[in-house]
């Protein structure tokens, strides 16, 4: 690997450690030319599937859009950010485990609803009202019955 200080092409790995989450490797390197040390991180490159929208067009998967869906539904709800991060990670992991090149926006929405049902019932109903385009109060009642029935 090229030294970031002097640009020399040869560096030596001094130490390697697996990160706490096991998803990356931290390496300490030493430049053989200028003798300076630096740290690199090695992670697996994964490709998220393309998202097929309701109208049929395709878009790149957006981590930001996924996170925004969660944060809007959870706005002013007592759910800590680390729990939201874990839920976002679970949805991304499920998408990768599908092993598909394309996934429908509907599938992603259902995964988000499943995670919200675990995190916060009010957020679930908020998300469902937009995602399922509720037209009247009866649809809210149905969603509330659905989520409270799942709890029993």
Swiss-Prot record:
Cofactor(s), by name: Zn(2+)
Concerning InterPro entries, the annotation shows: ATP-cone_dom, NrdR-like_N, RNR_NrdR-like
Signal as UniProt keyword: no
Zinc fingers, unnamed class: 3-34
Specify the protein name. Answer: Transcriptional repressor NrdR
This entry's Gene Ontology molecular function terms read: ATP binding; DNA binding; zinc ion binding
**Pfam families noted in UniProt:** ATP-cone, Zn_ribbon_NrdR
Gene name tied to this protein: nrdR
Q: Does the keyword Transcription apply?
A: yes
Positions of disulphide bridges: none
What domain of life?
A: Bacteria
Show where the ATP-cone domain sits. Answer: 49-139
Role this protein plays? Negatively regulates transcription of bacterial ribonucleotide reductase nrd genes and operons by binding to NrdR-boxes.
Q: Please list which residues make up the signal peptide.
A: none
The family this protein is said to belong to: Belongs to the NrdR family.
Kindly list the biological process annotations in GO that this record carries. negative regulation of DNA-templated transcription
Q: What are the record keywords, sorted?
A: ATP-binding, DNA-binding, Metal-binding, Nucleotide-binding, Repressor, Transcription, Transcription regulation, Zinc, Zinc-finger
């Amino acid at each position: 690997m090229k030294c970031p200080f002097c640009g020399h092409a040869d560096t030596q790995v001094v130490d390697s450690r697996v990160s706490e989450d096991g998803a990356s490797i931290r390496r300490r390197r030493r430049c053989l030319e200028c003798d300076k040390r630096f740290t690199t991180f090695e992670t697996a490159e994964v490709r998220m599937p393309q998202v097929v929208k309701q109208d049929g067009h395709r878009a790149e998967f957006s981590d930001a859009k996924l996170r925004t869906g969660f944060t809007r539904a959870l706005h002013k709800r007592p759910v800590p950010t680390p729990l939201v991060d874990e839920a976002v990670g679970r949805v991304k992991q499920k998408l990768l485990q599908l092993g598909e090149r394309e996934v429908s926006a509907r599938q992603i929405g259902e995964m988000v609803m499943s995670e919200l049902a675990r995190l916060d019932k009010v957020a679930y109903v908020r998300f469902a009202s937009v995602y399922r385009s509720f037209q009247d109060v009866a649809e809210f009642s149905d969603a509330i019955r659905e989520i409270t029935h799942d709890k029993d």
